[in-house]
From Swiss-Prot:
The keyword Membrane applies. The small GTPases Rab are key regulators in vesicle trafficking. Essential for maintaining the integrity of endosome-trans-Golgi network structure. Together with LRRK2, plays a role in the retrograde trafficking pathway for recycling proteins, such as mannose 6 phosphate receptor (M6PR), between lysosomes and the Golgi apparatus in a retromer-dependent manner. Recruits LRRK2 to the Golgi apparatus and stimulates LRRK2 kinase activity. Stimulates phosphorylation of RAB10 'Thr-73' by LRRK2. Regulates also neuronal process morphology in the intact central nervous system (CNS). The modification Phosphoserine is found at S72. CDD domains: Rab32_Rab38 (cd04107). It holds the Pfam family Ras. GTP binds at S33, K34, H35, Y36, K37, T39, K126, V156, K157. It is found in: Cell membrane; Cytoplasm; Cytoplasm, Perinuclear region; Golgi apparatus. This is Ras-related protein Rab-7L1. The keyword tRNA-binding does not apply. A lipid is attached at C203, C204 (S-geranylgeranyl cysteine). One of its GO terms (molecular function) is dynein complex binding. Interacts with LRRK2 (via the N-terminus); this interaction is direct and stimulates kinase activity. Belongs to the small GTPase superfamily. Rab family.
């Protein structure tokens, strides 16, 4: 029996200089550099995982520049994404509070086929630095109030919790994919023209 491929698009967003590009490089190539140029627009990377004996997962990682939240281009960048990562710098309170704006922007422009928000992890990056500008209790409350799948502290520099966090996200996407397949198989071919569009869907 051949291997089955799953292709997922994952957004990596957050303010400038919180470590998005470093995260993508660390996760996709297991490399780290202190010297990265600011991303202009969007950058891409691919991560391939042998998920099981019969399943291969290919992740398209979209590293979106911090200033892009203020442009109309984000709708184009977000299209067809299966999940997202929102990052902030634990030593910078402004990047933490702006995570809410990033989440709101995502939720207003992107949903799963079911109409539900895409799974989204909140990563408290640069946890190797001190002092922290926000407490763990603040982050935990913020994560719950804003509908994140969950949060964890990370250090891209020290490679702390990167693979573990992404595995949680992949598991969530795989579960959603299986649910979509099950839903499609039970619906048959009948088209119900009276069904209202799912919340969050807009005509492009």
């Amino acid at each position: 029996m051949g291997s089955r491929d799953h292709l997922f698009k994952v957004l990596v967003v957050g303010d400038a200089a919180v470590g998005k590009t470093s995260l993508v490089q660390r996760y996709s190539q297991d490399s780290f550099s202190k010297h990265y140029k600011s991303t202009v627009g969007v950058d891409f990377a691919l991560k391939v995982l042998q998920w099981s004996d019969s399943e291969m997962v290919r992740l398209q990682l979209w590293d979106i520049a911090g200033q892009e939240r203020f442009t109309s281009m984000t709708r184009l960048y977000y299209r067809d994404a299966s999940a997202c990562v929102i990052m902030f710098d634990v030593t910078n309170a402004t990047t933490f509070s702006n995570s809410q704006r990033w989440k709101q922007d995502l939720d207003s422009k992107l949903t799963l086929p079911s109409g539900e928000p895409v799974p989204c992890l909140l990563l408290a990056n640069k946890s190797d630095l001190s002092p922290w500008a926000v407490s763990r209790d603040q982050i935990d409350r913020f994560s719950k109030e804003n509908g994140f799948t969950g949060w964890t502290e990370t250090s891209v520099k020290e490679n702390k919790n990167i693979n573990e966090a992404m595995r949680v996200l992949v598991e969530k996407m795989m579960n959603n994919s299986r649910e979509d397949i099950m839903s499609s198989s039970t619906q048959g071919n009948y088209i119900n023209l009276q069904t209202k569009p799912s919340p969050g869907w807009t005509c492009c």
